[in-house]
Amino acid sequence: MITLRKRSKPINLNMIDTDLSIILFLQGQDWATPIMRLASSLGSLEFMLLSMPFLYWCWDAKQGFMIGLMLVTSHGLNAVLKVALHGPRPYWVDPAVQAQSTQPSFGMPSGHAQNAVSIWGLTAHLIHKRWAYLLAAGTCLLIGLSRAYLGVHFMGDVLAGWGVGAVLLGSSIKAMPVMEE
């Protein structure tokens, strides 16, 4: 195993090579660009912040508040994890990766993937219908793939984001009875 030292943390080049191969394969599908941009926007902080007033005033104030609290928690934790893990973005590592957007922060874990699982997952749980769970799962998958396609995350970043989002979602669901009191 070859490792590269950056900021005293070893980076596994074999893993990066594999992730770069996936990204470059995905980016070879030019027809998918508009779909991937749209999918990525569904996991963006801006989209979720714009959705909060609708959820609060038009859907259910208590559930809208819970989703808003999850968003603040997820976003804050993601910012801390990015600084702690300081993983590079694909376009920082390989100039062959076409960055469809640039980000000033580190890449690990993917905030879009993390927010997708925590927010879309919580929304599905609150709706508690099969179609909502399927929609949430499909949306999370598409958002994660879009982040690799757009060249802003390695698949490992996306997997880590999904994992952190799942932990937040599970913790939130477990804490709901206490929060409702």
Predicted features and spans:
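Membrane-embedded catalytic cores of phosphoryl/pyrophosphoryl-handling enzymes
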Residues: 51-52, 57, 65, 75, ...
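Residue-level detector of alpha-helix boundaries and kinks
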Residues: 24, 65-66
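N-terminal transmembrane-helix/juxtamembrane module of multi-pass inner/ER membrane proteins
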Residues: 1-47, 79-105
